[in-house]
Amino acid sequence: MQLTDKELEIVEILEKDSRTSNEDLAAMTSLTVSETEEVLKKLEDQKIIVRYTSIVDWSKISGHEGVTAMIDVKVTPKRGVGFDEIAKRIYRFKEVKSVYLMSGAYDLSVIIEGQSMNEVARFVSQKLSTLDSVISTTTHFILKKYKHDGTIFEPDEEDKRIVVSP
């Protein structure tokens, strides 16, 4: 679908900060609030804007450390449905946060979250690897997040450059 310049501008603003109010969106795009609301409804109805989310640094909250793993999955695609059927079976598991079709050495990239490495290991061995089309898996545990969806998790460091003025 082709978006107008204003629609695209709204999408880009909301992608950076989904908490931007309709009034602020209107001011930033030179639209009225009612025009902005119409654009948002259209974008939501057409599933261009799918969901409004927050990025949380869970490592700073005691008791919510958890484990995130990226799993490379090789599968045998089925005639007529390709990778879609197995991807659908995988993304229905509650542990699964994301599934991507990939190019390269493996077919699917699956991101899951669990409370412990053992919980992730049980998911891989008891649920994921037992699916008919799955040939092999390789699990990578995320040790630390530095940047996620464009957001840097490390605190801003002071600028140590010397100020030069005329």
Please place each PLM-identified region on the residue numbering:
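A compositional/biophysical signature of low hydrophobicity enriched in polar/charged and small residues
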Residues: 1-166
